Amino acid sequence: MNMIVAADKNWGIGKDGQLLTHLSGDLKYLKERTLGKAVVMGRKTLESLPGGRPLPGRTNIVLPANPDYEKEGCVIVRSMDELREKCAEFPADGVMIIGGATLYNELMEECDSLFITKICEEFEADAFIKNADELPHYKVVWQSEQQEEHGIKYQFFEYKREK
């Protein structure tokens, strides 16, 4: 499994259930990296998507806190163990965690690749992920040129777990 996330300089990823900023280049990157794959998310992440609907062209796997939660067009799993079992049904590169912070932090070190958009600014955030640069078994294997949108600079990084 893998994960994709955008984080600011302090590894903040969200505030009040929303992204810190909307960068069309980052959203395009997310689409390119996830289309045709299984995307794993919590309920709040699902409900923050446009219209609160599953992402088209992907298998949407949702782990809600509420055991009675149902959502049309989604595969609902009830525990981390069930989530891991469901993810094992897909090729390793065919599963992408897309949020939120609880899932990222729980599963980050189980991921083969971390696709991280580093935003070169600090935002007021209330949701954070672990600092990928401090994870001992990961190294950067690719990084893009720096991008800029609406005066906000950012860069794409791919981290790989060393075997």
Region annotations inferred by a language model:
Residues 5-38, 43-78, 84-163:
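Flexible, gly/pro- and Lys/Arg-enriched active-site loops
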Residues 1-3:
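Extreme N-terminal starter segment of soluble prokaryotic enzymes
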